[in-house]
Amino acid sequence: MNRLLQKGTSLVPSWRTRGCRYRRCSYAPQLHAKPLEMETSQRRMNPLNIQMLSKGFHEQIFRGKQVQHAEEDVQRSITHLKNHELWGQETSTVPDVELQLPKMYGNNIEEHFQILAQKQSLPYLEAANDLLNCQLPAMPQTWAWQSGWTRYTATGEKELVDFPDEKAMVFDVEVCVTEGCCPTLAVAASPQNWYSWCSRRLIEGRYTWSKELLLSDLFPLETSMNCNYMTKNNWTERLVVGHNVSFDRAHIKEQYLIKGSKTRFMDTMSMHMAISGLTGFQRTLWMASKYGKKKGLQEVKQHIKKTRSNFSGSPISSWDWVNISSINNLADVHALYVGGPPLEKEARELFVKGSMSDIRTEFQELMRYCALDVQATHEVFQEQFPLFMERCPHPVTLSGMLEMGVSYLPVNQNWERYLDEAQTSYEELQKEMKKSLMKLANDACQLLTKDAYKEDPWLWDLEWDIQESKQKKTKISKKQKKANEAAESVGNKLVEDHNEDPGPPTEKEESRPSMGKLYLEDLKLKTLPLLPKRNQHLPGHPGWYRKLCPKLEDPDWLPGPGLISLQMRLTPKLMRLTWDGYPLHYSEKHGWGYLVPGRKNNKLNNEEEEEIIPCPYRAIEDIYAEYSKNKTKDGCLSQHSTIPEEFMLTDDNSMWQKVEELSRTEMDLSSEVPATAKAKKRNNSSEHPVKLEMEFDSLPDNHHGNSPCGDVNVSGCWFYKLPHKDGNANNVGSPFAKDFLPKMEDGTLQASTGDSSATRALEINKMISFWRNAHKRISSQMVVWMKKNELHRTITRDPEFDEENKYGAILAQVVSAGTITRRAVEPTWLTASNARADRVGSELKAMVQVPPGYHLIGADVDSQELWIAAILGEAHFAGIHGCTAFGWMTLQGKKSSGTDLHSKTASTVGISREHAKVFNYGRIYGAGQPFAERLLMQFNHRLTQEQAAEKAKQMYAVTKGIRRYILSKEGEWLVEELGISVERGEENSVNLQDLRKIQKDATKRSRRKWNLVSRRIWTGGTESQMFNKLETIAMSPSPKTPVLGCRISRALEPTAVKGEFITSRVNWVVQSSAVDYLHLMLVAMKWLFEAYDIDGRFCISIHDEVRYLVHSKDRYRAALALQITNLLTRCMFASRLGIQDVPQSVAFFSAVDIDKCLRKEVTMDCSTPSNPNGMEKRYGIPQGEALDIYQILKVTKGVL
């Protein structure tokens, strides 16, 4: 595999040359900022009447560069805005902000960030260079069986040490999973020595250990075991390299100290994602290719059949990318970059499934396995790092990734309280739901009387057969007959005696057994022989009910239908669920759907007709009539459902993954002329090879949905499938799935009127959905608790410190570049939704609570991706802020007047503003019109396919515009040579009709393949200029981010994928630029914290928000530093795109949050079913502060 990397490894010498430019800089900024005196005329407006930075700011940041715009560019911008009815709209202004900024490095904003990042990353680059150029010493043959660290010198000596005192090392940790989270053993290697570490739990072998993790359970990397505090100046810069190194970091003692060390972590898995990472779809194809390309193609075709049945053409034409990429595990990454024999990974299973005793038995072999992983990681690093530096050359990228790798989440005793109360609430609601379901089952069982079930729209097709009670037939002998007659006479005597007054019993009678007891004993003796040897299970009850009840021999037996659950197929029927008023029904072939009455002929036109199931369709008509009556009375139902959780853009960064799922097969056909009408007709004719002959005249007029399934033979009714999020070709396995929660909330999916038990069960299912899905991940979070002497004195000396409370931390295991866009990835914290009043445990993020004497400060970057996409389009179009309709709406649009981006899209298509927001982000992420069609039908299932297609077409025509074609030299020659008349548009382009005409005439001239198109452009839309720029970057020979120059993964470069994966490439431009934005912010904040001695550290970044943990005395200065950081980052973006200015409206955060816990808004009380009293009453955490730039300047007097 080394041949794949010849180009990369040849760059090592040139990287070293560049490395010398990462010089230490003694040039320090001023430590105090002073407010400027107000000038009489500071406000600056650009030619489009948009307020820009004040004169003072512009002079400080852009160093007096004159902003000039060509009159032609201004007029073109005005004309464009007029075409979209935006020119002349009211623009807003705000008071200018006056502040003396810290003195910056270099001659301009770009040099400032360059020098700043070089200064921050230089020590780590030097350490990386040591690892890059070294050969590890020989691996020890035997490993020391002793707790703590052991050093193995080059001479073969072993010595016990406090910690590996090394500047750079490669590292790997192993954990015995069955014993908990405590590290079991570790191996490290430096250019000089090998090291091993063994835990006391492994060596001492006690019977029990504390379940709570303490600092003493972790291994030290920078201090002795008994040292828990070092002054700021005593920490030294160290570099630790590992594969998925965030897992290893979580087991290091010093990383839990609140002040934080200067050790940074370099992840070979993250570097691999940046160099040769794969999209989700590519990972599937890569795995398929392991079994041969034919199988890979087959899987692609199957995927396309499921997602886009009308797709035509060869799906994947290039497989070159498979050979220059791999999935993320160390074995495959090593095979890609290093090659050679495959890594041995069998021993890993012993750590996953084995016990501590097993590990002791195989100690030497397992230590060798861990050491081989360290060696493999070092080999990967040596091949990777030059490639990484070549493909991500800006020092800000490296510095930002190093900072991302030291996340820190403080927690206290409320974390355990949260876990207990969420689990208790979940279990109580589960019991209540089961009780409701059992009641429904018991009530339904009563329908057996007089065959009432036959008229029930839901239960008519259940298993209603009854098991009769059985008894043995026995021959009665003469002796038995006499005994029976005697017993009968005794019984008669008892009856006679019962009718007479017997008087008081005698003493002899009292001592004898009573006649009643004797009678019962006799009855038992006669009954037992009649019972079968094997007890019957609930005779006299219907079959479906018997399956819900545990048998008597079951050790957990309880009376009643205790086995019922939401996962059972009959539960939706027992709950009498309806979809738009129609009862749900299950088909073995098509999954869950619903029955719509009105079918007149429900016989298939096959020779062998199946027997029609007697369905009570009249009862269904009555139910729908009642539903319609109630709907009219309550007002029409909303045509737009509530937004699904995965599209909550402010909650997490999963929007792109969703877009990729829905549009992953969209490919670039730029080299092809669009299909002719004849070809389209041929494709359409084969779209449905087998069609059932159905009587379409009988289809209901008042119902729209997926086409009915004519092969579901239910008398008098059509069967419609429930809409699936991934398209009509997929079946719905359960109507209780997460995707249907919005439909429950808007009333589309509901329990029929009547018994409240079903409605309550539905409500509970929604309430417990979050905790049911997430509780394992949340409960398994690795929390390390600290004793008082392990806490920093800033905590213990604070008046709010309480020795009875617990203080600890969670190190979120964030992969700093977990996707091809270099976005960070982590399964719990980076995907956690905000607290919701109807979701148990959804107050998760608010459980990150600061210790006494500290605050969290942070902010969301306002419309981050929208602004990035907008400024790319503006720089491409006229170089003026607000010169495109998309840019103008992003900067100046107002929700109140309907001129903001989301309101404009909503009014154009007739959808809600929240839904419009999803479509807008989806387009920016590269999703095409088919994505919009499917999403429209998902948001509003009442739309027909035709209506959705029309709305999507209208939306894309207004926003993205119309596709036009710029002819190649060959195409222009044909137009002139053949005298073809064409209509010219923007950039001398032609439309689709003219292109087809040229193709037709050219084919008549010669049968050779003509290359007519040079490139394609979008015209006429509000976003056309932006998309032209995005596609220009995405389809360039070497796509790279415009600001920091990071290149796209080799697995997506055009040379490897040809014209495919366009959605992923367009999305990469915006998302990867957003990562550049984050890295710039992290670098700037680190600079300001160090320069102005602000006591704080990076906490976490969740999508477009950042949070810092800051000592309370510095919280307002930190808030000001965050505002300055945003200003400088925006200016860096504009400068790199050739625009020497920034609009005032985006220069600062709308608000910086100062809070005691992690939550979306400082005013959120985070009331949930598991936290009904909210944060203030239950946990004593009041509302925080949200301060804009003017309020921060007032508090700080403009001084950092």
From Swiss-Prot:
It catalyses: DNA(n) + a 2'-deoxyribonucleoside 5'-triphosphate = DNA(n+1) + diphosphate. Residues 472-481 have a biased composition (Basic residues). Its cofactor is Mg(2+). It is found in: Mitochondrion; Mitochondrion matrix, Mitochondrion nucleoid. Residues 494-512 have a biased composition (Basic and acidic residues). Residues 471-515, 667-688 are annotated as: Disordered. Keywords: DNA replication, DNA-binding, DNA-directed DNA polymerase, Magnesium, Mitochondrion, Mitochondrion nucleoid, Nucleotidyltransferase, Transferase. The keyword Ribonucleoprotein does not apply. Transmembrane segments: none annotated. GO terms for biological process: mitochondrial DNA replication. The keyword tRNA-binding does not apply. GO terms for cellular component: gamma DNA polymerase complex; mitochondrial matrix; mitochondrial nucleoid; mitochondrion. Its EC number is 2.7.7.7. Disulfide bonds: none annotated. InterPro entries: DNA-dir_DNA_pol_A_CS, DNA-dir_DNA_pol_A_mt, DNA-dir_DNA_pol_A_palm_dom, DNA/RNA_pol_sf, DNApol_Exo, POLG_palm_dom, RNaseH-like_sf. Its main location: mitochondrion. Pfam families: DNApol_Exo (PF18136). GO terms for molecular function: 3'-5' exonuclease activity; chromatin binding; DNA binding; DNA-directed DNA polymerase activity. Heterotrimer composed of a catalytic subunit and a homodimer of accessory subunits. Belongs to the DNA polymerase type-A family. Involved in the replication of mitochondrial DNA. Associates with mitochondrial DNA. This is DNA polymerase subunit gamma-1. It comes from Xenopus laevis. The lineage of its organism: Eukaryota, Metazoa, Chordata, Craniata, Vertebrata.
